[in-house]
Amino acid sequence: MDQTTPQLRCSVGVTAYNEEANIGRLLDALLSQQLHVVDISEIIVVASGCTDNTIPIVESFVAREPRVRLFVQPKREGKTAAVNVFLSNAVEDICVLESGDTIPHPDAVEHMVRMFADPAV
């Protein structure tokens, strides 16, 4: 990619319900993605009705990584409501959704987003 080609910017959303066992590894994996033509502008975590340590774990990431944002739904409202919170607050037109119980491949975001460089998409 030459210097005149713009980066593709995306927002990544994570929906989470009681994911203390995985959320830290997931955020580490997202923050260390191998990116060439894609830039992750923000990672929005929507914690819905969590009763474990998911929220404090995410708060520790928020404190040290400005791209990580946390939205808390005190009552569990379901995945659709959490996705709507993400989409309502995302700053980019390209949005990638992850579930709190996954670990993406090191170049997963690049592979999902880079197709948007094609004007036909």
PLM feature spans:
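Short, acidic, metal-binding catalytic loop of nucleotide-sugar glycosyltransferases
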Residues: 28-40
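Short aromatic/hydrophobic "clamp" motif used to bind/position activated sugar donors
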Residues: 95
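Glycine-rich, basic loop-to-helix element that forms the pyrophosphate-binding segment
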Residues: 73-90
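Cell-envelope/extracellular polymer assembly enzymes that use nucleotide-activated donors
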Residues: 8-11, 42
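Short beta-strand/loop segment that forms part of the nucleotide-sugar
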Residues: 39-49, 71-73
